[in-house]
């Protein structure tokens, strides 16, 4: 199954329910769904797809990276040698790469290659990887700080009404410490003791702030405190984890297994959240296995549709994250029921964008 062509498409698609994250750095994310879709075609006629939804722009830069740096490395190669092709791209871009734009571009191609392999075999990826088609636990995300106190609680209650047993709300940034404590207190009172509550700081605090606020929040029996400090502050992560009772988690802004080494060495972060845009399926499987070796669970960031194939076969799955941004974009969306999601049984990763999107919603910078 030799790779014969690689094509890209840039789209700007309206949200059905725009996110209200309430952080200036994420303003581009709130406006529209900017997508880069990549197609890997083989001489046998099989086409695999991958995509990127970066928060901070760079769409044309990512597209250029694919065509200028990576496509020449893959044309004429055997598509089924996915891990070897990942290493070929990694080595060829080592000077400019190792994270950022280059690894994101690699990740989209990696997902597309695996999709092609699954389609060629006529099997869903979880089956190809020796996994199970059983339903997977998924939590309700998107109780955004931009919704305000009442809006966050109302969205969480809608999730509970739909059968979710755990929700995630945001803290920090636009809220004072006292407001954060009041928001979490009221969320707990409204939901009761039987519903898990996760908190997402989006890198909004220093370690000292996280310890001060986190200590006040411990009494609310929280499932986790996510990204309390900036991604590179591993010392801060570990300092916070030592100081509060709530489990500290993170990883969505870390690239490849190399970025996770401090977490694996300390074993103080019990759950990691790698992002499929920062390594693709190939690296996320590596991360999962290395985490499992040191007793750490994995709850991949966003992209619950693609991640369902992964969680179905890794040894240490924890949660999928439901965010319904893409539900109206797929030909056959996967939708949770009562806080559970069954991975698709279609060949490959099983998700195709509606063809009309490519004509109706061209990219708008």
Question: Which role does the model predict for each range below?
Answer:
Residues 134-243:
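Metal-dependent enolase-superfamily TIM-barrel catalytic cores that perform enediolate-based chemistry
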Residues 215, 221, 232-340, 344-347:
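Shared catalytic-loop signature of beta/alpha-barrel
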């Amino acid at each position: 199954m030799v790779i014969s062509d690689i094509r890209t498409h840039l789209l700007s698609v309206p949200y059905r329910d725009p996110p209200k994250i309430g952080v200036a750095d994420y303003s581009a994310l709130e406006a529209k769904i900017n997508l880069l879709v990549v197609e890997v075609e083989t001489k046998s006629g099989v086409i695999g797809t991958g995509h990127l939804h970066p928060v901070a722009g760079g769409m044309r830069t990512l597209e250029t990276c694919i065509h200028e740096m990576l496509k020449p490395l893959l044309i004429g190669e055997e598509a089924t040698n996915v891990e070897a092709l990942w290493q070929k791209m990694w080595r060829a871009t080592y000077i400019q790469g190792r994270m950022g734009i280059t690894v994101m571009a690699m990740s989209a191609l990696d997902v597309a290659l695996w999709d092609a392999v699954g389609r060629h075999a006529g099997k869903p990826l979880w089956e190809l990887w020796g996994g199970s088609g059983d339903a997977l636990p998924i939590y309700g995300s998107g109780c955004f700080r931009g919704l305000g106190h009442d809006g966050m609680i109302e969205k969480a209650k809608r999730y509970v009404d739909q059968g979710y047993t755990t929700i995630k709300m945001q803290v920090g940034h636009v809220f004072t410490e006292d407001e954060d404590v009041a928001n979490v207190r009221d969320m707990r009172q409204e939901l009761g003791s039987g519903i898990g509550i996760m908190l997402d700081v989006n890198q909004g605090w220093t370690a000292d702030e996280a310890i001060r606020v986190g200590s006040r929040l411990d009494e609310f029996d929280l499932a986790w405190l996510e990204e309390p400090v900036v991604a590179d502050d591993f010392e801060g992560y570990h300092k916070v984890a030592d100081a509060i009772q709530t489990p500290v988690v993170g990883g969505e802004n870390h690239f490849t297994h190399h970025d996770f080494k401090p977490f694996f060495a300390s074993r103080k972060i019990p759950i990691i959240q790698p992002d499929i845009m920062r390594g693709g399926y190939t690296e996320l499987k590596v991360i999962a296995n290395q985490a499992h070796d040191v007793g750490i669970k994995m709850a991949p960031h966003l992209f619950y549709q693609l991640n369902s194939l992964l969680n179905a076969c890794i040894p240490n799955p924890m949660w999928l994250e439901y965010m319904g941004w893409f539900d109206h974009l797929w030909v056959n969306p996967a939708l949770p029921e009562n806080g559970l999601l069954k991975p698709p049984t279609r060949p490959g990763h099983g998700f195709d964008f509606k063809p009309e999107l490519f004509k109706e919603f061209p990219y708008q910078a």
